[in-house]
Swiss-Prot record:
Gene3D superfamilies attached to this UniProt entry: N-terminal domain of the delta subunit of the F1F0-ATP synthase
Organism: Granulibacter bethesdensis (strain ATCC BAA-1260 / CGDNIH1)
Protein name (Swiss-Prot/TrEMBL): ATP synthase subunit delta
Gene Ontology MF annotations: proton-transporting ATP synthase activity, rotational mechanism
Subunit field text: F-type ATPases have 2 components, F(1) - the catalytic core - and F(0) - the membrane proton channel. F(1) has five subunits: alpha(3), beta(3), gamma(1), delta(1), epsilon(1). F(0) has three main subunits: a(1), b(2) and c(10-14). The alpha and beta chains form an alternating ring which encloses part of the gamma chain. F(1) is attached to F(0) by a central stalk formed by the gamma and epsilon chains, while a peripheral stalk is formed by the delta and b chains.
Membrane topology qualifier: Peripheral membrane protein
Keywords: ATP synthesis, Cell inner membrane, Cell membrane, CF(1), Hydrogen ion transport, Ion transport, Membrane, Transport
Spans annotated as Disordered: 1-31
Length: 221
């Protein structure tokens, strides 16, 4: 039998039920079987699906505001810990070991069963590398539900207080006075910033500039 077309693979994905897995109850609405490799656009769509499932899961728990606050704290924890980011993004670490290590961190930091079940489901689906993107997508969804605008800001290093103040001033100057900033550390950017506000993208990263230089050099060759 030949390979199954991608659209049929998507249609055949099962959705998590309320049954338990190794890490606790699965989060309703999250695909339990997924293709291993996805494009950047697909990753964005995947993050939104997980974020939507988490929002529904949190709402059903009766502690939506508490879950929102703790997921925000988890995002900050990832941004502040190079070791944790390395663990999440490493293809060399066994999936089960990575899951257990991350869940141990959540236990030590006082996260609840809700966050533990969610992260466990993400890990079991081999999506720990997308966890920070999922958290950012969750923040955007929360802002939309509240009628707020949100700027997702990716930087190679955690922004200092001065840099964040300068960024907010630049956003105000650009007409985004009442916007919430969702920060995300991505060392692969090398330097500069990537700012997403709705469908608008502002990319001043060193990585992007180097890529443009490479394209220009290839075109001149």
């Amino acid at each position: 039998m030949g390979p199954v077309p991608e659209e049929h693979q998507r249609e055949s994905e099962t959705v998590a039920s309320n049954g338990a897995n190794e890490s606790g109850a699965a989060v309703t609405g999250i695909p339990q079987r997924e293709a291993k490799h996805v494009s950047g656009t697909a990753v964005s769509g995947l993050a939104k699906r997980y974020a939507s499932a988490l929002y529904s899961y949190a709402g059903d728990s009766g502690d939506l505001d508490g879950v929102i606050a703790r997921i925000e704290a988890l995002g900050r924890l990832i941004d502040e810990s190079a070791d944790l980011r390395s663990l999440l993004g490493s293809p060399l670490v066994d999936v089960n070991r990575a899951r257990d290590a991350v869940l141990a961190v959540l236990d030590r930091q006082g996260f609840t069963r809700i966050e533990r079940n969610f992260v466990g489901t993400v890990a079991n689906n081999r999506r720990l590398g997308s966890l920070r993107s999922i958290i950012s997508a969750f923040a955007v969804l929360v802002a939309e539900k509240r009628g707020e605008a949100v700027a997702v800001v990716e930087s190679a290093h955690e922004l200092t207080e001065v840099q964040e103040h300068q960024l907010r001033a630049s956003l105000i100057e650009a007409g985004y006075g009442n916007v919430r900033i969702e920060k995300h550390v991505d060392p692969s950017l090398l330097g500069g910033l990537v700012v997403r506000i709705g469908t608008r993208l502002y990319d001043t990263s060193l990585k992007s500039r180097l890529q443009r230089l490479q394209y220009a050099m290839k075109g001149a060759a």
